[in-house]
Amino acid sequence: RTDLACTFMCGWPWLRHGATHRIVAAPVPSADYAQGRPVYCSHFIVRADSAFTRLEDTFGRRFAYTIEDSHSGYNAPRHHLMQCRGADGRALFGEIVGPLTTPRRVLEAVVEGRADVGPQDSFAFDLMSRHLPELASRVRIVASTEPVPIPALMASNGVSPAVIETLAAALCSVGERPELAGLSADLCIRGFARLDPASYAIAETWAREAEARGLATIR
């Protein structure tokens, strides 16, 4: 669509498909991992009542993922896991479960015992922890990736620069408006910030590094 004014989009597929949309602003999560920046990470989760205490404890078991072109649901976990892969190239997991498409479905697969470990987009997990605490409390985080730029609100190139600037200014003022504090709390954000498009290049760098180490796919 040429008239798309504001949609939440993952930076890695955006970059891979030619970066044809323009960044409006990005959320700044209120969680500690963000440290006041528009970043997020991937958490590796296990069932809360499981015996797993480290990511390495899950090797040989079942790993769930969202989709292969997701940064948080596949690319970032793959890059993290390349550090654990031995020189013999042996598979880390006994079974790969997916694609499950969404973080919630990965979480549900772990809770229901269909998988032993899986990644969570940290921002999505923040939201589920706030709004679905009975579900999110049934898992534990055993490891997290390094934070990278978070998905942003983007607009089509057909939207005028003036409209994009107006939207960006309004979004970036959210953290300074006390009347929006309740909404910000429900969204698990401090506010919004502008984001340099070039910062998303880290996702492609991680992909190349994992592929160079023989981890084109998680296994």
Predicted segments — roles?
Residues R1-A19, E56, T102-F123:
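Short helices/loops that flank or line small-molecule/ion binding pockets
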Residues R1-D3, M9-C10, A19, A181-R219:
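N-terminal hydrophobic or amphipathic helices and topogenic motifs
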Residues C10, P29, Y33-V106, G182, ...:
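Bilobed "Venus flytrap"/periplasmic-binding protein-like clamshell domains
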Residues W12-W14, F52, D126, P161:
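Glycine-rich nucleotide phosphate-binding loop and flanking beta-alpha elements
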Residues A25-H43, H131-L171, D186-A198, I202-E204:
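Periplasmic-binding protein-like
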Residues E68-A162:
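Pocket-lining segment of extracytoplasmic ligand-binding domains
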Residues C172-E176:
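Generic secondary-structure signature for well-ordered alpha-helical cores
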